Amino acid sequence: MDNHRDGVWIIDAGAQTTYANERMAELLGTSLSEMIGQPSFAYLFPADVEAAQHLFDVKKGGAPNPFRFRLRKKDGSALFVDVQGTPLHDTAGVFMGIVGTFSLSKPLNER
């Protein structure tokens, strides 16, 4: 995953960052050491937190649909991404988190 051309970001059941590849940190304009252990919602604009929480809850249930989202880079600018999130479960079926792949997207008004 470290050499993946897209950003890869793994969050646990509490939405804390447990893994990210270099590309994900690069997309967000930050470092891996700054990302690991941080709440994933720290990379959102306040107006997007409620929608992100809803998507997180939907992904817990295994919804496979990709979605487009806006993230907040370290410098405060917007990053528009297409996200494919996959829920992670242990052998007993308990939800453990989500692995997401993130690719650059254009804002809807630029399409």
Which positions does each model-derived feature cover?
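Sensory modules in modular signal-transduction proteins
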Residues: M1-A13, T18
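PAS-family sensory domains
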Residues: M1-N3, L27, P64
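Short loop/turn elements at sensory-signaling interfaces that couple input to output
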Residues: D12, V83-I98, L104-P107
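PAS/PAS-like sensory domain cap-loop motif
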Residues: M24-M35
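PAS-family sensory/regulatory domains
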Residues: E34-A47
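PAS/Per-ARNT-Sim sensory domains
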Residues: F45-D57
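Soluble sensory domains of the PAS superfamily and closely related sensory modules
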Residues: V58-A63
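PAS/PAC sensory module
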Residues: N65-R70, D75-Q84, H89, V99
